[in-house]
């Protein structure tokens, strides 16, 4: 399977866009914890190496790449709580966390690349959805790593508060142990 690249972003840069944000979320299939989204604006001169869909990167490498993103990129992370998920449903909560991440960037993006087939409503920037975008766009891949590392760290802290669910290992995703309980 090919690695994500910077082709979509390069095309947008050639059209005059300067600040291009990639957006992705994690936690939609979980039975515990928030849905977490990240928006990342890569510096085209300092793209971190190893970027890929967070599901295809080992824990150790995700941590290294996350540090590199922190050092070289503009990003924002946002969550939708369990209560919000219950009130508005997981899809709407995912879109809400994406919108919060985009609006929370300290640089307003000219263009937003969004993983999936739905875009949050009310964005001030132009946007495009890309199905499996975390496997196609480096900006979205970076967002997937930031969202995953941030949410996994949150679930590890939650594991200390509520031992016995193994949240630090399964990050809130259902396991055979949960299904047999």
Regions found by a protein language model. Name each.
Residues 1-181:
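RNase H-like, Mg2+-dependent phosphodiesterase core
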């Amino acid at each position: 399977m090919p690695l994500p690249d910077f082709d979509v972003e390069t095309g947008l840069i050639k059209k005059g866009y300067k600040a291009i944000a990639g957006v992705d979320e994690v936690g939609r299939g979980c039975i515990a914890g928030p849905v977490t989204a990240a928006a990342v604006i890569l510096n085209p001169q300092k793209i971190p190496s190893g970027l890929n869909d967070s599901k295809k990167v080992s824990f150790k490498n995700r941590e290294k790449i996350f540090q590199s993103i922190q050092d070289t990129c503009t990003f924002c992370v946002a969550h939708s709580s369990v209560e919000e998920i219950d009130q508005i449903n997981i899809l709407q909560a995912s879109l809400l966390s994406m919108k919060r991440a985009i609006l929370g960037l300290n640089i307003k993006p000219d263009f937003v690349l969004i993983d999936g087939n739905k875009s949050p409503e009310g964005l001030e920037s132009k946007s495009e959805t890309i199905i499996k975008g975390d496997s196609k766009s480096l900006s979205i891949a970076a967002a997937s790593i930031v969202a995953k590392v941030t949410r996994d760290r949150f679930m590890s802290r939650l594991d200390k508060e509520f031992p016995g669910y193994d949240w630090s290992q399964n990050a809130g995703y259902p396991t055979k142990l949960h299904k047999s309980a």
